[in-house]
Amino acid sequence: MIQVRKRDGKVVPFDLEKIKTAILKDLKAIGHEGDLEATASKYADEVFALCEQKYLPKTSIFDIENIQDTVVQVLAREGELRAVIAYCEYRYQHKLEREQRVKKVYEDKLMAKHVVNQNANIDEYSGGGRSGEAANVYEKQYALDHCMSEKARRNHENNEVYIHDLNKYAIGFHNCLSIPFDDLLSKGFHTRQGDVRPAGSLNTAFQLVAVIFQLQSLDQFGGVSATHLDWTMVPYFRKSFMKHYIEAWMKDQQEYESSDCLALYDQTYTDALGVTRSAYEKWTDGAKEKFFEKTGLTKDDFKLANKGKLNKRYYNSALADTIQELHQAVEAMYHNLNTLQSRSGDQLPFTSVNYGTCTEEEGRLVTRALLLGSLEGIGFHHNTPIFPCGIFQYMKGVNDKPGTPNYDLKQLAMRSTSQRLYPNYANVDWSGNAGYDRNDPRTYFSTMGCRTANGYDINGLGQLKDGRGNICPTTIIMPTLAMEADRDVEKFMKLLDEKIHEAKDTLIERFNWICSQDPKTAPFMWDNNTMAGYIPEEGIRSAMKHGTLALGQLGLAETLQLLIGCNQTTPEGMKLAKRIEELFSKRCKEFKEQYKLNFGVYYTPAENLCYTAMKKFKAKYGVIKNVSDRDYFTNSIHVPVWENMTPFEKIDIESQLTGYSSAGCITYVELPSTTKHNVDALEQIIDYAMDKDIPYFAINVPNDTCMDCGYTDEINDACPVCGSHNIRRLRRVTGYLTTDYHNFNLGKQAEVKDRVKHIKSFAKKEQTA
């Protein structure tokens, strides 16, 4: 069947009568004589014949612009020059009308009309949000018109292969990055306006983490993460500990009693570099030199493990001061990352921190402080912080069971999860991260909060995570393909294979576009080598090639329902699901070898796409029971949120599919707010997920806070303490949290309401041999 692609991307059946009507209207407008009906029919037939000749061998879908060009060609060939002029004027008028419609959309965004909340972290009513959303209207259109192939545009507009963050395409930004904090904190970094010296204390290091997160987020469109923050902070804990130890020693010296600190601070001197400093600094520097001379200690001695070598009183004093500094530094970081609105729309950087594997006492204290900071909350009412996304790295022999060095930290992590939803759990021993170096935490499995992960780098960096990230994602909207394949399994598999190849081409197009950018477009990133492997002489491709190209998917459950009448919760559905995922995995492995780029299977979060894709699907195919009778598609390979089952059953189902993903996935279970009183049951679930080789796992529990008195629990209509209806209802949107689920788009709100708690049983599932 021949079809027509309209300018808005919609595909409709070809209708020769419409061409005839347009030509007839044109002939009447110029006062053409004779049998106008017959003439218009003749010209319309010629247009169709010429379109068949020019386009049908390549495609059965004619673009409306090509059809109209052919009308002009036929009229000119027939000598109807006045008709050509009139028809061109007609096209021009319609172009102006289309531009007016775009202008109307722009104005609506600018004035915050018809807000849809595409991203729950953006305030579309704010000045920055209105400006950003309005600009996006033209930036998206420019990308579609000028930055990609016709095939990529067609797939995007036809609801088949979605191109994410289209508004950032033209400027050449990439998606996300795991930041090499070890290097940036130890060496310092440059910004456009100045530079920053290496961190000399815990407090400074944690402040700089927030600053670096913010700076890097402005050079990309996605999330930023720290892959092993507990290990990263060990040297800065020791620096602070040494400083506090020396201060304790100084206060015990006789000359300290006779010193006049105020007078010293008032005095200045010029050092060898010409820098003006206070005399107090010179005095303390001199005291430090005396300290090392008199005690015989070196900087390397200041480790908590060296307690026997250090003075007990100074040790205890320094440790108390350092722990206090650590607590305040972590508290400040949490508040900074929840208030540094550095993107348009009062948007916070999407930050994640991975931790939990460092067994050095300093690193253990850092992990403990991060977890206590999560439990304590932020602000007047100790609200649950939505950033950073905390991710506890679950590692066998380190923190998985009683008797391991960091098991106590796992217990604290579970307390935090049961109350604050964070941390999530990254499976360091996941089979997909095989070959990591247990002596190098930079290779441990880590992830972004949403689920993006770095697999094995084919271009030489192996399992290294720091300095790598996702370059760009696409998502295949599988329910559309199922309908286009007439709900036939074999036709669908053939079409899916075709679209996987086309999605690959789309990713390569965007990758090349990104690599064509001047390093000046992201000065912080390239001046400070935050992306690994950057060689200035070779351009930014030298670094980008180490990132991932994510080939995502949406709506497996609905696709199976269309094809065979059931989803992956049934044996028949799971069999076809595995066949589909095997195809994704096989092709990505082939592409990775063929192009020497890190293609990976991605189980898309689809925060906004779940809603927009469904709207387009309904508009074309109508309401289909168990497929489009809701306002959203199910994310990737997830079990539909309305399916009633135990957490163990959900893990059993999704664990059969998560192994196919190499670019990121997540598994959730929904639990009641009473989970905080049953942490033992929570541990059974987490351990079961890790044993089932789930790479990234999260727990959803209700988290409602009264904004008048601060009471936090699952709250119905009114606060049980003060009766207030001013309730913040925090829920998870992808892997991240958001301030209130009413900030989600309508589709995501509907999904939240449909979520059932997996509480059929908390009894531990017996393992079968």
List where the protein language model places each region.
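Charged, amphipathic alpha-helical regulatory modules used
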Residues: 1-114, 750-756
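A ubiquitous short alpha-helical element
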Residues: 6-11, 29-38, 461-465, 541-546, ...
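Short, mixed-charge aromatic SLiMs
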Residues: 46-51, 75, 576-590, 751-764
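Contiguous, well-ordered alpha-helical segments that form the cores/surfaces of helical PPI scaffolds
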Residues: 549-562, 582, 732
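Conserved catalytic cores of very large enzyme subunits
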Residues: 93-97, 103-545, 566, 570-731, ...
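Catalytic-loop motifs flanking and including active-site residues across diverse enzymes
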Residues: 15, 19, 472, 549-556, ...
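Long insertion/accessory domains within large nucleic-acid-processing enzymes
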Residues: 717-769
